A protein has these predicted regions:
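Hydrophobic, aromatic-enriched alpha-helical segments typical of multi-pass transmembrane helices
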Residues: 1-249, 253-257
Length: 257
C-alpha cells in the first residue's frame, strides 16, 4: 500500500524539469563543442580572431545558445523547487538560490564574447590600436568566460548537492541514483574550490573530471523525470514528505525571483 505524497503540481513540474534539463544540456553541449570550440585556436589570438570574423553568425548562434541555457536553468530551478519544497522548503529554496547565482554568473560569458566581437569590429575609435593588440584583448575577453564558469561552478555544485540530498530524503527517484548525485556534486564543489586556489590542479585531475559526474547525474535525473516522473514513496518511507505534501504546492516562481 502506498501513501499519496505527490500532487499534480509536482508531477507537472517533474515533466517541466525533465524537458528543461535535457534542453539545457543539449544547448550547452552544442554551443560549446559544435559551434564555439572549432573557432578557438589555443595560444593563437590572431587565428582565433580570423575564425570568429569569418564565422560571426556561428559565433553569435553559440552566444544565443548560452543565453537560452541560462533561461533554461531558471525554468529548471523553479520546477525543482516545486518538486522538492514539500521535502524541506528551506533547503529547496537554498538550492534554487545557488542555481540562480550560477545562472547569473553564466550570463557573463555571452557579455565577454560580445565584447570580444566589438574589439574585432571596424569602429573608428578602434583605429588607434594595433590589430594584434585588439586580437589579444579579444582573446582575453574569451578567456574570461572560462573564469566565469569556474567562479560559478561551486554554486552549481552546491545547488546539485542540495537537490541530490533532497532526492535522497524524498525517495522520488531511485536511492542509488540520489547517493551518486550527492557524491558527484560534492566532488564538483571540492574540485572547483581547489582549482580556484591552485590553478595547476587540473594537471593532476583533468578539468572534465571536475563536473562530468555531476553532469551525468543531472542528465540521468532529467531523463528519469521526463519519462518516469517522480515516484510515490511507500508508506513509512518518507513520513515527513507525506506530512508536508498535504499542503498545496503551486508552480509559481520562488519569492526571490
Amino acid at each position: 500500500m502506498t501513501t499519496c505524497t505527490v500532487d499534480n503540481a509536482q508531477r507537472t513540474a517533474a515533466k517541466i524539469a525533465g524537458v528543461a534539463g535535457l534542453v539545457a544540456f543539449g544547448l550547452v553541449v552544442f554551443a560549446n563543442y559544435v559551434l564555439l570550440d572549432p573557432l578557438i585556436v589555443p595560444r593563437n589570438a590572431a587565428d582565433t580572431a580570423r575564425n570568429i570574423l569569418a564565422h560571426q553568425t556561428q559565433f553569435r548562434v553559440a552566444l544565443t545558445c548560452f543565453i537560452a541555457y541560462g533561461i533554461g536553468s531558471v525554468v529548471l530551478l523553479s520546477a525543482l523547487y516545486t518538486i522538492l519544497a514539500p521535502v524541506n522548503r528551506s533547503l529547496a529554496f537554498t538550492g534554487a538560490l545557488f542555481r540562480l547565482v550560477f545562472a547569473i554568473l553564466w550570463l557573463i560569458a555571452p557579455l565577454n564574447s560580445l565584447a570580444a566581437l566589438r574589439l574585432l569590429g571596424d569602429a573608428t575609435y578602434l583605429k588607434v590600436f594595433e590589430p594584434d593588440r585588439l586580437q589579444a584583448l579579444a582573446r582575453v575577453q574569451l578567456a574570461g568566460s572560462f573564469d566565469d564558469y569556474y567562479v560559478g561552478l561551486p554554486f552549481f555544485g552546491l545547488a546539485a548537492t542540495v537537490c541530490a540530498w533532497l532526492w535522497l530524503k524524498s525517495n522520488y527517484i531511485p536511492k542509488g541514483l540520489a547517493i551518486f548525485g550527492v557524491i558527484a556534486s560534492a566532488w564538483c564543489v571540492l574540485c572547483a574550490f581547489i582549482f580556484l586556489i591552485f590553478p595547476n590542479f587540473n594537471k593532476i585531475v583533468n578539468d572534465y573530471i571536475f563536473d562530468s559526474p555531476m553532469a551525468i547525474f543531472e542528465l540521468i535525473v532529467s531523463i528519469w523525470l521526463l519519462f518516469k516522473g517522480i515516484r510515490t514513496p511507500k508508506s513509512g518511507e518518507a513520513d515527513l514528505v507525506a506530512e508536508r505534501s498535504r499542503k498545496s504546492v503551486s508552480l509559481r516562481l520562488p519569492a526571490f525571483l
